[in-house]
């Protein structure tokens, strides 16, 4: 057999079948090789094979396959004598020896890479070494001594590299730097896991020079007699692994399995609940704090794959969170839980005490309360809003509000005053924002009731430094919003500002809400904000328009509601549903963006208010347009409202009004004829007005507005017929006092809406007809004249290569001034229009709409 092919098949590259040979097979092979040097290399050799191999070896090799290795040929059992002599005895390694040899090879590769500073290779080999170490643990071999030595040497080399990098002017390249940082972190983690081994190596390195397993060394050091079997492994565990108390042993086991697949979280929760019950009276405060934090977190994790947290688990978490806060309050001079705390190396290590002697444990009360509140909101989102279950669930809102107030008081006590305006106070900002979100949409009476209930079980000597107890609702909202606006980062400040606007608007403080909205200029930056803030902005804008209507400021109400009420995505813009897709097609993330039903703005009320304000504005405007010769080219500002009237007029038969739209259209037709009483009767019969508190006051305001706008419509419509009108008669027709009629007509005369005057006795209004009433032919001739003028100017520009005739310098300056004035007017008009433009909710990230 050719020596070239034989040497190409070393024992190190043997197959996995060789690694899995049993000890009996190894002994059989070694005995056979000792008894007969000319026996076959095959593990299946027997007497008949030996006979055949002897006979086969007599002949010379022949045939096209004579050079192939006989071990791989079916039925071959002979081995070349010369090859066996040259190669020596074949060594078959066990799986254990091969695994340890692979680890030694990886360590040698790491040492080679260390000499040249190749951190990429070090990282690759260290990862390979880690995988081999896992196999070592699976086969219960024990931690090899050379692995501990490798960790120690690698730690020393890392520290040396760090020192050299600080002193050297030439920095490590980016690839090596990333690999170095990764190796540094993983070595640190491994050293932490094998800390007892490392300490032993640092004190007595000579013990690790032998190949003896560490179990024997550990038992010798411990002064215990050498044991065999399972007792020996237990002796190693006592020295090699860190000893935990029974409580922290359980917590450590649960912590290591969190996030892994096929873990029974219900069993973990039950284990922690039993542990809490057993140690509630005997455990140390630090043990109880650790149990509470893990139990609350795992309960939340258990419901992460569900639509919402089961109500029984939610109530358990709420009760445990209250107990947790009570524990922290009773041990406030010894322990605190805060995001400003120090993270310890292990779960059972207590943090060092600060200057006041308090140990600050790392944790977040604010995050736990936020998560509980989010689960409460999710349960409302997935419940039928018209069911009894929704009403029963909504009663828990007062429970979560109590918890938020308690949490705010605790976080205030653990957050130093000097950092409240910094980023470190984020937990305080978040919980204050939660409190504001729970009250900003409620009327004052309900806020006062919630506050009374929340402070009932809190000690009288405990008070908030942000907003003191027993503050009235207005001071409460202002105090919370001012704290966030002045101290927190922009997102909390903007959200607090919008909550304040919404609160003022819903509690009939329209002037404050409008001034705050306009002075903040939030409308200029809202389009770059996140979706939740844009939804809050749209809600505040709608509530501002409704408040303006209730205050009788019809034009501002119409201006605020104009764009958003005509939008095809009204539900999406307000976070109340989906217009562009069916609810079943919405993703979970999209559903979670929606608001619970009890926070919704009634869309029918919004439509009714907008159409009523459009009626009060557009009917007089259309009458003025149709009767004015000067403004004959002016169009009504709202085509959609006029189109509703035109559509109604084209119908052959119209029944009595049924919907809100029908009532408003019939009321508009009556108002066009000056019949304000019929218009009021139709509008007041709409049942949606009963949803507004003090609706009698609202209907009284609407009656006055209809009387005034009916008077103006009547004058615009019939001014060309009358030359004189009695103010007393107008007062009787529209049920308005004479002084009010005189004031209304005077306001129409001054800007030139009508041509006329009031006599000295203030009894009559005289209409003048100085303006010649143009015929239809004359109006068409005027329009044609304007178009001919434009055509002439275009022809002149064409004849002069795009330039018009040169005008005198003075005329050019006048035109420039006019253009500048027009530009300024357009900018002012554009800014005015943008003030009440709704935010197009998250059009970039496609969170609310199907097309981005």
Curated annotation (Swiss-Prot):
The cross-references to Pfam families, in alphabetical order and at most eight, read: eIF-3c_N, PCI
Domain of life per record: Eukaryota
Keyword tags: Cytoplasm, Initiation factor, Protein biosynthesis
Query: Could you cite one Gene Ontology molecular function of this protein?
Result: RNA binding
Report if keyword Protein biosynthesis is assigned. Answer: yes
Residue stretches making up the PCI domain:
597-772
Compositional bias (Acidic residues) at which positions? 14-57
Primary location recorded for the protein, binned into one broad class: cytoplasm
Bias-annotated ranges (Low complexity): 810-822
Q: Where in the cell is it found?
A: Cytoplasm
Name any GO cellular component annotation: eukaryotic 48S preinitiation complex
Give start-end positions of Basic and acidic residues composition bias.
Answer: 823-835
Show the coiled coil region(s).
none
Residue ranges of the region described as Disordered: 1-90, 798-852
User: What are the recorded Gene Ontology BP terms?
Assistant: formation of cytoplasmic translation initiation complex
UniProt biased composition (Polar residues) = 798-809, 841-852
**What is the documented function of this protein?**
Component of the eukaryotic translation initiation factor 3 (eIF-3) complex, which is involved in protein synthesis of a specialized repertoire of mRNAs and, together with other initiation factors, stimulates binding of mRNA and methionyl-tRNAi to the 40S ribosome. The eIF-3 complex specifically targets and initiates translation of a subset of mRNAs involved in cell proliferation.
Q: Which PANTHER family match?
A: EUKARYOTIC TRANSLATION INITATION FACTOR 3, SUBUNIT 8 EIF3S8 -RELATED, EUKARYOTIC TRANSLATION INITIATION FACTOR 3 SUBUNIT C-RELATED
Family in the record: Belongs to the eIF-3 subunit C family.
Q: How does it assemble?
A: Component of the eukaryotic translation initiation factor 3 (eIF-3) complex.
> Can you name this protein?
Eukaryotic translation initiation factor 3 subunit C
Q: Which organism is it from?
A: Debaryomyces hansenii (strain ATCC 36239 / CBS 767 / BCRC 21394 / JCM 1990 / NBRC 0083 / IGC 2968) (Yeast)
Taxon lineage: Eukaryota, Fungi, Dikarya, Ascomycota, Saccharomycotina
Query: Which gene holds the coding sequence for this protein?
Result: NIP1
């Amino acid at each position: 057999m050719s020596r070239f092919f034989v040497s190409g098949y070393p024992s190190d590259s043997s197959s996995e079948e060789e690694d899995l040979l049993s000890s009996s097979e190894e002994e059989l092979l070694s005995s056979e090789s000792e008894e007969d040097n000319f026996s076959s290399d095959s593990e299946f050799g027997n007497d008949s094979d030996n006979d055949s191999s002897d006979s086969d070896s007599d002949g010379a090799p022949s045939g096209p396959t004579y050079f192939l290795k006989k071990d791989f040929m079916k039925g071959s059992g002979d081995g070349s004598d010369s090859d066996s002599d040259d190669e020596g005895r074949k060594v078959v390694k066990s799986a254990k020896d091969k695994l340890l040899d692979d680890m030694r090879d990886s360590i040698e590769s790491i040492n080679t890479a260390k000499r040249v500073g190749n951190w990429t290779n070090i990282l690759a080999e260290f990862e390979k070494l880690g995988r081999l170490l896992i196999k070592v643990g699976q086969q219960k071999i024990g931690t090899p001594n050379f692995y501990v030595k490798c960790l120690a040497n690698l730690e020393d080399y890392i520290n040396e590299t760090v020192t050299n990098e600080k002193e050297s002017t030439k920095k490590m390249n980016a690839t090596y730097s990333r690999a170095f940082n990764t190796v540094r972190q993983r070595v640190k983690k491994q050293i932490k896991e094998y800390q007892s081994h490392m300490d032993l190596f640092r004190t007595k390195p000579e013990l690790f020079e032998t190949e003896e397993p560490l179990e024997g060394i550990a038992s010798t050091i411990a002064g215990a007699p050498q044991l065999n079997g399972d007792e020996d492994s237990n002796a190693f565990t006592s020295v090699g692994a860190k000893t935990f108390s029974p409580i922290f042993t359980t917590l450590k086991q649960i912590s290591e399995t969190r996030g892994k697949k096929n873990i029974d979280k219900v069993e973990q929760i039950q284990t922690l609940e039993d542990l809490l019950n057993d140690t509630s009276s005997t455990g140390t405060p630090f043990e109880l704090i650790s149990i509470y934090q893990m139990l609350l977190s795992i309960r939340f994790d258990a419901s992460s794959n569900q639509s919402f947290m089961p109500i029984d688990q939610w109530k358990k978490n709420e009760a445990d969170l209250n107990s947790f806060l009570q524990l922290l309050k009773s041990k406030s001079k010894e322990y605190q839980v805060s995001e400003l705390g120090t993270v310890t190396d292990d779960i059972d290590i207590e943090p060092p005490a600060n200057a006041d002697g308090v140990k600050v444990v790392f944790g977040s009360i604010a995050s736990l309360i936020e998560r509980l509140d989010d689960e409460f909101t999710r349960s409302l989102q997935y419940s039928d809003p018209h069911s009894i279950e929704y009403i029963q669930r909504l009663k828990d809102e007062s429970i979560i509000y109590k918890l938020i107030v308690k949490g705010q008081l605790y976080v205030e006590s653990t957050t130093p005053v000097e950092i409240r305006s910094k980023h470190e106070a984020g937990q305080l900002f978040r919980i204050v924002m939660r409190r504001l979100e729970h009250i900003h949409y409620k009327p004052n009476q309900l806020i006062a009731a919630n506050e009374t209930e929340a402070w009932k079980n809190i000690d009288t000597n405990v008070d908030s430094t942000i907003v003191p107890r027993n503050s009235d609702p207005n001071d409460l909202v202002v105090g919370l919003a001012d704290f966030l606006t002045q101290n927190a980062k922009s997102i909390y400040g903007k959200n607090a500002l919008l909550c304040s606007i919404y609160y003022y608007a819903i509690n009939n403080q329209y002037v404050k809400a409008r001034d705050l909205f306009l002075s903040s200029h939030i409308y200029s930056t809202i389009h770059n904000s996140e979706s939740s803030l844009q939804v809050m902005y749209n809600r505040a804008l709608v509530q501002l328009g409704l408040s303006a209507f209730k205050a009788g400021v019809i034009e501002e109400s119409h201006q605020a509601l104009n764009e958003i009420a005509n939008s095809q995505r009204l539900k999406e813009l307000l976070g109340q549903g989906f217009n562009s897709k069916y609810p079943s097609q919405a993703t979970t993330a999209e559903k979670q963006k929606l608001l619970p039903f009890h926070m919704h703005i009634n869309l029918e009320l919004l439509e009714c208010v907008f159409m009523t304000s459009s009626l009060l504005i557009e009917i007089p405007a259309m009458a003025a347009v149709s009767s004015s010769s000067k403004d004959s080219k002016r169009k009504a500002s709202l085509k959609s409202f006029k189109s509703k009237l035109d559509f109604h007029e084209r119908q052959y038969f119209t029944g009595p009004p049924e919907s809100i739209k029908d009532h408003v259209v019939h009321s508009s037709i009556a108002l066009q004829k000056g019949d304000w009483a019929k218009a009021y009767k139709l509008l007041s019969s709409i049942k949606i007005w009963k949803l507004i508190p003090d609706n009698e006051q609202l209907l009284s305001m609407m009656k006055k507005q209809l009387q005034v706008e009916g008077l103006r419509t009547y004058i615009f419509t019939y001014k060309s017929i009358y030359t004189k009108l009695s103010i007393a008669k107008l007062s009787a027709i529209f049920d308005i006092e004479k002084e009010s009629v005189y004031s209304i007509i005077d306001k129409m005369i001054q800007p030139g809406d009508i041509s006329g005057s009031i006599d000295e006795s203030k009894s009559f209004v005289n209409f003048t007809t100085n303006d010649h009433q143009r015929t239809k032919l004359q109006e068409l001739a005027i329009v044609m004249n304007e178009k001919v003028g434009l055509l002439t100017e275009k022809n002149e520009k064409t004849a002069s290569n795009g330039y018009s005739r040169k005008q005198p310098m003075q005329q050019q300056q006048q035109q420039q001034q006019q253009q500048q004035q027009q530009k300024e007017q357009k900018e002012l008009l554009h800014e005015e229009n943008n003030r009440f433009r709704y935010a197009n909710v998250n059009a970039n990230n496609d969170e609310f709409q199907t097309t981005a």
